[in-house]
UniProtKB/Swiss-Prot annotation:
Protein name: 1-deoxy-D-xylulose 5-phosphate reductoisomerase
Source organism of the structure: Francisella tularensis subsp. tularensis (strain SCHU S4 / Schu 4)
UniProt function note: Catalyzes the NADPH-dependent rearrangement and reduction of 1-deoxy-D-xylulose-5-phosphate (DXP) to 2-C-methyl-D-erythritol 4-phosphate (MEP).
Keyword set, alphabetical order: Isoprene biosynthesis, Manganese, Metal-binding, NADP, Oxidoreductase
Lineage of producing organism: Bacteria, Pseudomonadati, Pseudomonadota, Gammaproteobacteria, Thiotrichales
Group of enzyme by EC: oxidoreductase
Length: 385
């Protein structure tokens, strides 16, 4: 008898959750076992009615009561303990880790400790605690499969998806669209509005990640992820601006060969690849018509995109705590920008100041990660007044 793969989707109401559920709708291979949401209870209720999960998780009791008033045939759990439970249940096979921000850290670790197949879209798990998460994955024989289009592309380009071929890799090259302001100089961005920063030319994404794309913070975080996912030194990671977002990333091998993964910019492709791995599943994605594209590439200038400069410097110095500071400061500053409390250029300007002024030892456990994160946010709040 055919057995469906049971999946927990952390962050089911976000853009990655949407694409994951779109894949599930098109196939008959997956059973949604648990769904979680932070604020959009109405949408979560609709998803519960459609997919009939056994569990749903919301952040607090008031949202639990609201969800229970909308749906009756699902067990509603609350808070961090609920997230960790649905990430580690014996019945589930796959955990889609798509919560935005450091809130995704503990449930991702819970899935790793339970030996689950983790589809990783939550950047912060690797950005803030990469050394700790990789240790947990290895120790518990879990699987960590990247969902970001760039890292999933690299995952597909590396022979056997393991580390036996690492000596053969000369360079991992991440591509970046460059965002909506890729052709503008910094002095032209003084009066950028949140609406302009969120208007990504190629991808449909949430507001925070759209701003991160425009500042190239998103790509800087992806450099950190690649560092941990593929066990390569910082000098073996490169970034190219590729406005068409068709070549999702590539690997250069020591014999001069380049292997790239291409496709239309649709998150269903990397998500389906991760969900079905080690096989491939059929999903409804537009075919790539090569006759319609002229693919162009250019170097990502570190002076123009200073987020890259900050992160590469942190990795070269093995200053992993500084990456926690960088990430926490960015989250606070982007929120301030979206609420029109600071100017667009201050996102990076203030982050440079904070990253330079705060110094911590590399964390030895997840509690220390959260402590560095908390202190950074408090410091940013004091700077912003």
């Amino acid at each position: 008898m055919f057995k469906k793969t049971k999946i927990t989707i952390l962050g089911a109401t976000g853009s990655i959750g949407d694409s994951t559920l779109a894949v599930i709708r098109e196939t008959n291979d997956f059973e949604v076992f648990a769904l979680t949401a932070f604020s959009n209870v109405e949408k979560l209720a609709e998803l519960c009615q459609e997919f009939k999960p056994k569990f749903a998780v919301v952040p607090d009791l008031s949202k639990k009561q609201k969800l229970q008033s909308l749906v009756t045939d699902v067990e509603v759990l609350v808070g961090e303990s609920g997230l960790e439970k649905v990430s580690s249940l014996a019945e589930i096979d796959i955990v889609m880790s798509a919560i935005v921000g450091i809130a995704g850290l503990k449930p991702t670790f819970a899935a790793a400790k339970a030996g689950k197949k983790i589809l990783l879209a939550n950047k912060e798990s690797l950005v803030t605690a990469g050394h700790l998460l990789i240790d947990e994955v290895v120790k518990n024989n879990a699987q960590l499969i990247p969902v970001d289009s760039e890292h999933n592309a690299i995952f597909q380009c590396i022979d056997n998806h393991d580390k036996k071929c690492l000596p053969e890799i000369d360079k991992i090259i991440l591509t970046a669209s460059g965002g909506p302001f890729r052709d503008k100089q910094l002095h032209e961005l003084t009066d950028v509005t949140p609406e302009q920063a969120c208007n990504h030319p190629n991808w449909q994404m949430g507001r925070k990640i759209s701003v991160d794309s425009s500042t190239m913070v998103n790509k800087a975080l992806e450099v950190i992820e690649a560092y941990w996912l593929f066990s390569v030194s910082a000098d073996k990671i490169g970034v190219l601006i590729h406005p068409q977002s068709v070549t999702h990333s590539m690997v250069r091998y020591v014999d001069g060969s380049y292997i790239a993964q291409l496709g239309v910019p649709d998150m269903k492709t990397p998500i389906a690849n991760a969900m079905y791995y080690p096989k491939r599943g059929s999903v409804n994605v537009e075919s790539l018509d090569f006759t319609k594209y002229q693919l162009t590439f250019r170097e990502a200038c570190f002076e123009r995109f200073e987020a890259l400069k900050i992160v590469f410097n942190n990795l070269q110095n093995k200053n992993y705590a500084a990456n926690i500071v960088f990430n926490a400061a960015n989250e606070e500053l982007v929120a301030a920008f979206l609420n029109k409390k600071i100017k667009y250029l201050e996102i990076i300007e203030v982050n440079k100041k904070v990253t330079k002024e705060l110094n911590f030892e590399n964390p030895k456990n997840i509690e220390e990660v959260f402590e560095i994160d908390r202190k950074t946010r408090e410091y940013v709040d004091s700077v912003l007044g």
